[in-house]
């Protein structure tokens, strides 16, 4: 993290809202420049340099975990000259242009305000991607070639110019300050406000901003990105689990573009049974990390155990593998269902990791209601004709209208339609 206390203090004093972006940049400028210099020294590269560039990610650092609520920007520092420097440095043109097109899209969405805000809006970047994939006769983003990715960058920047009236920023520090202020702004986005209201998190806490040197999971077949949990967040079972994707980055794991693979062999076999995939096809096309990257898996498994023992709670972790080397991006106490909350607290107590008082404090009264939700009869579930499968956002079983947009759900609920 480049800075946290200064950023949090700025928000606590409401200076960001009252003084505006320019004043905030002035207040934080010296601290950020010094911290960037320190990261440059550690990474032996230079921010904005053409020959030996440092790329960074910019993400939130709120004191309370708010998974998925705040905005993140990856690959910051790229422009038309820097991307050529990355190619010269790595010898991997596809990786460089793939990172560039991801950056322009993410920056356009988060910083330049081009992300759709309602169901009527069309995402200009996704529309362009689908158009290019269709013209090239491919289905997946990772099937696009270097020339296709170059075309995407060109069309993305044209879309930015058309929608904002300005050229896409090329100065690394201009990009950085835009991203920092966008993360501050995301503290007050609608989903973050609603999440804080549900979780009882005060608005005045604010968020810090973390700027980290990039590591890349999209450098080829020896690279990957993933998320994992030291215990099952749904049931509380003491079972290491998670998902990963080879040659991918950031939100690819949860974006639904490609089918993620399981971290453990047991998890992969469980997934295959639920998905109706034979063992031969699973092993050939969807191997677990334990099978495909055994040495990385052993290191990851050892580290997740070490982290849980240190924090004495179930951990939610994000990681990247860059050309065979494992990097941890973050760890936090994982969110869990009511049933998992009780089981994890009791298991940690029995395992001697926490005492009775701590176990009781881990049980949130408002989540006990989840234990009373109706559930499917297991025997009936086995006989059910399943139309599709997915990851549940809440516990229990439900019947009713399928709703694809949050606005529709709120509107229909107000009209007593659901």
PLM features: what roles do these ranges have?
Residues 1-7, 11:
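Single conserved hydrophobic/aromatic residue that forms the stacking wall/gate
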Residues 5, 59, 211-214, 225, ...:
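Generic beta-strand/beta-sheet core signal
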Residues 12-13, 119-150, 313-381:
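Terminal amphipathic helices with adjacent charged low-complexity linkers/tails
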Residues 238, 245-250, 300-315:
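Phosphate-binding core of ATP-grasp and ATP-grasp-like enzymes
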Residues 353-418:
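Protease-associated
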């Amino acid at each position: 993290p480049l800075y946290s206390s200064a950023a949090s203090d700025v928000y606590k004093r409401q200076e960001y809202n009252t003084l505006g972006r320019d004043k905030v940049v002035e207040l934080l400028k010296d601290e950020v420049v010094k911290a960037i210099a320190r990261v440059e020294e550690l990474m032996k590269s230079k921010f904005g340099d053409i020959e030996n560039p440092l790329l960074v990610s910019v993400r939130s650092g709120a004191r309370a975990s708010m998974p998925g609520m705040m905005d993140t920007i990856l690959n910051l520092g790229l422009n038309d000259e820097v991307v050529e420097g990355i190619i010269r440095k790595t010898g991997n043109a596809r990786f460089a242009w793939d990172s560039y097109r991801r950056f322009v899209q993410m920056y356009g969405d988060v910083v330049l305000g081009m992300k759709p805000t309602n169901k009527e809006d069309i995402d200009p970047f996704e529309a362009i991607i689908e158009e290019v994939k269709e013209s090239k006769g491919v289905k997946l983003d990772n099937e696009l070639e270097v020339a296709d990715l170059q075309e995407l960058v060109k069309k993305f920047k044209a879309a930015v110019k058309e929608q904002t009236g300005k050229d896409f920023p090329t100065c690394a520090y201009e990009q950085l300050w835009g991203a920092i202020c966008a993360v501050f702004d995301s503290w007050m986005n609608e989903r973050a406000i609603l999440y804080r209201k549900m979780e009882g998190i005060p608005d005045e806490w604010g968020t810090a901003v973390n700027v980290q040197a990039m590591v890349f999971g999209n450098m080829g077949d020896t690279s990957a990105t993933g998320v994992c949990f030291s215990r099952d967040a749904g049931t509380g079972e003491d079972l290491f689990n998670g998902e990963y994707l080879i040659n991918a980055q950031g939100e690819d794991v949860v974006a639904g573009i490609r089918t993620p693979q399981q971290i453990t062999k047991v998890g992969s076999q469980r997934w295959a049974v639920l998905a109706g995939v034979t063992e031969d096809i699973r092993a050939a096309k969807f191997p677990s990390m334990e099978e495909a990257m055994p040495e990385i898996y052993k290191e990851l498994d050892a580290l997740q155990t070490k982290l849980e023992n240190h924090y004495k709670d179930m951990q939610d972790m994000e990681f990247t593998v860059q050309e065979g080397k494992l990097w941890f991006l973050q760890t936090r106490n994982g969110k869990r269902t009511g049933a998992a909350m009780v089981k994890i607290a009791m298991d940690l107590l029995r395992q001697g990791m926490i005492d009775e008082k701590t176990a009781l404090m881990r049980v949130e009264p408002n989540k006990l209601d989840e234990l009373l939700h109706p559930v499917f009869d297991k025997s009936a579930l086995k006989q059910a004709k399943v139309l599709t499968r997915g990851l549940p956002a809440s516990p229990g079983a439900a019947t009713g209208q399928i709703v694809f947009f949050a606005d529709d759900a709120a509107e229909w609920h107000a009209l007593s339609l659901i």
